[in-house]
């Protein structure tokens, strides 16, 4: 248990209220014999009077402030539990009798008339004694070893009149606040990872100036660890920035590829629409061709496909006939024309001279006007009946002159 006592722990039921004097208006002081008190209280009072008289005789009154400062500084230190034995109070009082009850007012053989004042004086004395005992016990215990950092070394707390309580006992709140501030500084300095070079130099100078060689090595190791951690953080930041740059580049390429894909999809859609339009045009042209064939069939009375085949057959049958010096009239067969009346003509009237003039020689063919004038007339008559609006394709199947027809093949 802690040996520090609080004012709230002491209440009125610990001692009885002294009886009211018979003549309160009289100014005659009342002695201790006239007040009925219990034996322990009077014994404690006599003990305090003896201690106060011995303290006054041994020390001057000017040392009261030093005693109060010593009590406040000792009270601000952490208390040690497990030493709550009140049997050693007399031993501590005998050893340090000079420091007891220096802040308490001087008491006399007479007791104050008012019972409340008397109770307050007793409370003050008791609290002073308790504070003295606590200070002696804390002083007898060896303080904890301080850390290597100079910030953790506790400075002696200087008490001021404002920190002293109403009863002359100093409060330990400033010391606790200071200790809390030191611990918070240590925690923040240990948890914080961002240090500047100037702070590192200051810390190194402070640590190397007031520490042992082992502590100096430890501090240097800590500084090197911080520097390595700083370098690693810098490398990580550079890597992160590089990765972010690559990500931005990839995002740009991705956006460009998406644009190209959208353009290709648009072109594909346009091509598909154009293909459908062309297919529709092809179907329309096929329908028009069928209508034209029906019109030709209705006008000519025959299938245009058969007409095209017959014209091709006539072209294949017009082959030249070879001979040495003469051509037979029966060797030339006119083309078959189904709607021509000239086919019934006799072939006797159609002929080509068999003997050429002697001056031209055998290798020269006769002119068309002399050799094939009747045949030319027949062909002209055939073309006259066949060519007019008989071909639906708009081109003539028969040649208009005989210049395209070979008359003789030279050996």
Curated annotation (Swiss-Prot):
Kindly report the protein's main subcellular placement as a broad class. Answer: nucleus
Q: Respond yes or no to whether keyword Ribosomal protein is given for this record.
A: no
Q: Among its keywords, does the record have Phosphoprotein? A: yes
Q: Which locations, inside or outside the cell, does it occupy?
A: Nucleus; Cytoplasm
Domain bZIP: start-end pairs: 215-278
Cited PROSITE patterns: BZIP, BZIP_BASIC
Q: Which UniProt keywords apply?
A: Cytoplasm, DNA-binding, Hypersensitive response, Nucleus, Phosphoprotein, Plant defense, Seed storage protein, Storage protein, Transcription, Transcription regulation
Show the segment(s) annotated as Disordered.
1-36, 76-99, 140-251, 362-411
Q: Where is the composition biased (Basic and acidic residues)?
A: 89-98
Biased composition, class Acidic residues, residue ranges: 196-206
Q: One Gene Ontology cellular component annotation?
A: cytoplasm
For this chain, one GO molecular function annotation is: nutrient reservoir activity
Q: Where is this region: Basic motif?
A: 217-236
Provide ranges: composition bias, Polar residues: 24-36, 146-173, 183-193, 368-390
Residue positions of the PTM Phosphoserine? 196
Q: Which Pfam families match?
A: bZIP_1 (PF00170), bZIP_C (PF12498)
Tissue pattern of expression reads: Expressed in roots, shoots, stems, young leaves, trichomes, hydathodes, siliques, seeds, and flowers, mostly in vascular tissues.
Q: Name one GO biological process term.
A: plant-type hypersensitive response
For the region Leucine-zipper, give the residue spans. Answer: 243-257
Protein function: Transcription factor that binds to the C-box-like motif (5'-TGCTGACGTCA-3') and G-box-like motif (5'-CCACGTGGCC-3'), ABRE elements, of gene promoters. Binds to the 5'-ACGT-3' motif of seed storage protein (SSP) encoding gene promoters (e.g. At2S and CRU3) and promotes their expression in seeds when in complex with ABI3 and BZIP53. Involved in the defense responses to the biotrophic pathogen Hyaloperonospora parasitica and oxidative stress responses; mediates positively cell death. Promotes BZIP53-mediated response to hypoosmolarity stress that leads to POX1/PRODH1 accumulation.
State the name under which the record lists this protein. Answer: Basic leucine zipper 10
Q: Which organism is it from?
A: Arabidopsis thaliana (Mouse-ear cress)
Give the gene name: BZIP10
């Amino acid at each position: 248990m802690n040996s520090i006592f609080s004012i709230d722990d002491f209440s009125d039921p610990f001692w009885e209220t002294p009886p009211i004097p018979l003549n309160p208006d009289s100014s005659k002081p009342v002695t201790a014999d006239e007040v009925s008190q219990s034996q322990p209280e009077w014994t404690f009072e006599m003990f305090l009077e003896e201690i106060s008289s011995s303290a006054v005789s041994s020390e001057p009154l000017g040392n009261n402030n030093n005693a109060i400062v010593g009590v406040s500084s000792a009270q601000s230190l952490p208390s040690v539990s497990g030493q709550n034995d009140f049997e050693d109070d007399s031993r501590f009082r005998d050893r340090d009798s000079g420091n007891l009850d220096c802040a308490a007012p001087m008491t006399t053989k007479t007791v104050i008339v008012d019972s409340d004042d008397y109770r307050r004086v007793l409370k003050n004395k008791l609290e002073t004694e308790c504070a003295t005992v606590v200070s002696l016990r804390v002083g007898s215990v060896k303080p904890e070893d301080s850390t290597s950092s100079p910030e953790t070394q506790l400075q002696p707390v200087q008490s001021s009149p404002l920190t002293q309580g109403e009863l002359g006992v100093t409060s330990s709140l400033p010391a606790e606040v200071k200790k809390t501030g030191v611990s918070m500084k240590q925690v923040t300095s240990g948890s914080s990872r961002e240090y500047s070079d100037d702070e590192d130099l200051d810390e190194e100078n402070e640590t190397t100036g007031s520490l042992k060689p082992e502590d100096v090595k430890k501090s240097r190791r800590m500084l090197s660890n911080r520097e390595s951690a700083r370098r690693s953080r810098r490398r990580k930041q550079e890597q992160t920035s590089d990765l972010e740059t690559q990500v931005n580049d990839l995002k740009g390429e991705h956006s460009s590829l998406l644009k190209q894909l959208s353009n290709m999809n648009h072109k594909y859609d346009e091509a598909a629409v154009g293909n459908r339009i062309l297919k529709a045009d092809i179907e329309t042209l096929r329908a028009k061709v069928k209508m034209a064939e029906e019109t030709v069939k209705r006008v000519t009375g025959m299938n245009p496909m058969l007409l095209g085949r017959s014209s091709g057959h006539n072209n294949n049958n017009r082959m030249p006939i070879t001979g040495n010096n003469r051509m037979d009239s029966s060797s030339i067969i006119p083309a078959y024309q189904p709607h021509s009346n000239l086919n019934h003509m006799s072939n006797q009237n159609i002929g080509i001279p068999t003997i050429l003039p002697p001056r031209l020689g055998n290798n020269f063919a006769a002119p068309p006007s002399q050799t094939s004038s009747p045949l030319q007339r027949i062909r002209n008559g055939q073309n006259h009946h066949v060519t007019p609006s008989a071909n639906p394709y708009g081109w003539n199947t028969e040649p208009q002159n005989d210049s395209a027809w070979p008359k003789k093949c030279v050996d």
